[in-house]
């Protein structure tokens, strides 16, 4: 889990002081047991929520799912085995179990760090390179990156922990103790601390600062865009209507089933899918296909249902309309043509940027909470690692124990960060804990055009 041997198994401490009092043992056992239970419960809620709530199945949440898996391993195995070791005062499960525990602990903990790096890089590229990165940001690619993170963690720690004694020809770990053999050298301990904690933290903090600056820049651009619009104007027809250029009229001889010339004019705006934005959980920045320099037309073309030409009586078509369209000049169109009203494309662009900015800020809040929890819980132990490298007896045994357990507490805090910063996680957790989740009793209620909002139709 960390870059050095645990406090009770540190090479700086020959043996864990035995003979803890019964009240002390009871307090440690109850406290650590509750922490383990909270860790397992919280991360199981994350996994179950991802399974039952389709709104949570986004690319960004795939990384949170992987982080929850690592935290679940720590809560299930690492916490309980270390508590047993701490209370007994010696390792009583044999050398094989010791090596397997250390390998599992360090692989899962390093995978947590790798997943935090993935989340940070994912947010950074989503904000700074929205067009090029979003095209490559697929669930399959996210799964590949997560698999590589776990593979790298396994390759870095598991073989060295399990087979180091065979490489050097002997096992130097003292009987009754359990720690990583090759970390008994101070210089190696110092190097692993820098590579496994300080370097990743530096990278993550740098990326978060860049994300923060870019998000603030987006907010200023959005404020300027909204400020340039004229209040109370820019309202247009519904999404089922199209605007044509002034003077663009259909040909009297346009046959049924064909659209007039004004219908074939380039559309000012591309249809926008709110559903896609909802599911992705962060706003994308695909550019609109409209040309902001164009002005909307002064006529509204309303498409009417087609009529079978064979069933129609042979009548002469009116000279100013096609069989399937009706054009009507609008006052707004004349006002826009006369006053140079801003195109509706800017309103749509502002709405998209607003929605995008909200999603980006929500994802940034989740990242900041996870990153802050990681730094606060892992820093004390890793500071002690550096201190013990230069002064073996300067760190008390109790501080080693507290620092090591504090690293484990990070796995308990992470699910709370998801719930505090993400309403979808929070609502799903609440429904699961209250036993009110039943997919068959959920109905779809439209929130926006093209999106659905799931809400319980009745309680169970």
Swiss-Prot record:
Disulfide bonds join 98-178. GO terms for biological process: adenylate cyclase-inhibiting G protein-coupled acetylcholine receptor signaling pathway; cognition; G protein-coupled receptor signaling pathway, coupled to cyclic nucleotide second messenger; regulation of locomotion; saliva secretion. Residues 238-247 have a biased composition (Low complexity). Residues 49-62, 122-142, 210-366, 421-460 are cytoplasmic. Residues 225-256, 274-297, 310-351 are annotated as: Disordered. It is a multi-pass membrane protein. Belongs to the G-protein coupled receptor 1 family. Muscarinic acetylcholine receptor subfamily. CHRM1 sub-subfamily. The muscarinic acetylcholine receptor mediates various cellular responses, including inhibition of adenylate cyclase, breakdown of phosphoinositides and modulation of potassium channels through the action of G proteins. Primary transducing effect is Pi turnover. This is Muscarinic acetylcholine receptor M1. It comes from Pongo abelii.
């Amino acid at each position: 889990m960390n870059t050095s041997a645990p406090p009770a198994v540190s090479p700086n401490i020959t043996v864990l002081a035995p003979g803890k009092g019964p009240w002390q043992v009871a307090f440690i056992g109850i406290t650590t047991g509750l922490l383990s239970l909270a860790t397992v419960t919280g991360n199981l809620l994350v996994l179950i929520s991802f399974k039952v709530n389709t709104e949570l199945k986004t690319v960004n949440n795939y990384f949170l799912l992987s982080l929850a898996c690592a935290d679940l391993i720590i809560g299930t195995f690492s916490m309980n085995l270390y508590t047993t070791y701490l209370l007994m005062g010696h390792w009583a499960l044999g050398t094989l179990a010791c090596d397997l525990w250390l390998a599992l602990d360090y692989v899962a903990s390093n995978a947590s760090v790798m997943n935090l790096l993935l989340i940070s890089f994912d947010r950074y590229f989503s904000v700074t390179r929205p067009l090029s990165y979003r095209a490559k940001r697929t669930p399959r690619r996210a799964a590949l990156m997560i698999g590589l993170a776990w593979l790298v963690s396994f390759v870095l720690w598991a073989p060295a922990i399990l087979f180091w004694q065979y490489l050097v020809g002997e096992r130097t770990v003292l009987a009754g103790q359990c720690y990583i053999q090759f970390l008994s050298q101070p210089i190696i301990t110092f190097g692993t601390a820098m590579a496994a904690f300080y370097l990743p933290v530096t990278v993550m903090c740098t990326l978060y600062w860049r994300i923060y600056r870019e998000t603030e820049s987006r907010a200023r651009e959005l404020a300027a865009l909204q400020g340039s619009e004229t209040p109370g104007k820019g309202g247009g027809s519904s999404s089922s209507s199209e605007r044509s250029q002034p003077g663009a009229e259909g040909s009297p001889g346009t046959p049924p089933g064909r659209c007039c010339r004004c219908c074939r004019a380039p559309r000012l705006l591309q249809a926008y899918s709110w559903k896609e934005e909802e599911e992705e959980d962060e706003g994308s920045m695909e550019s609109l296909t409209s040309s902001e320099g164009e002005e909307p037309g002064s006529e509204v073309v309303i498409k009417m249902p087609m009529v079978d030409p064979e069933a129609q009586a042979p009548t002469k078509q009116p000279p100013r309309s096609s069989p399937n369209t009706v054009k009507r000049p609008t006052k707004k169109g004349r006002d826009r043509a006369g006053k140079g009203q801003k195109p509706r494309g800017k309103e749509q662009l502002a709405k998209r940027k607003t929605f995008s900015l909200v999603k980006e800020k929500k994802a940034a809040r989740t990242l900041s909470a996870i990153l802050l929890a990681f730094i606060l819980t892992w820093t004390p132990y890793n500071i002690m690692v550096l201190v013990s490298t230069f002064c073996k007896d300067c760190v008390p045994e109790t501080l080693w124990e507290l620092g090591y357990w504090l690293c484990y507490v990070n796995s308990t805090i992470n699910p709370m960060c998801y719930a505090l910063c993400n309403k979808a996680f929070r609502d799903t957790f609440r429904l699961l804990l209250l036993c009110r989740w039943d997919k068959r009793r959920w109905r779809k209620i439209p929130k926006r055009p093209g999106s659905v909002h799931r809400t319980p139709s009745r309680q169970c």
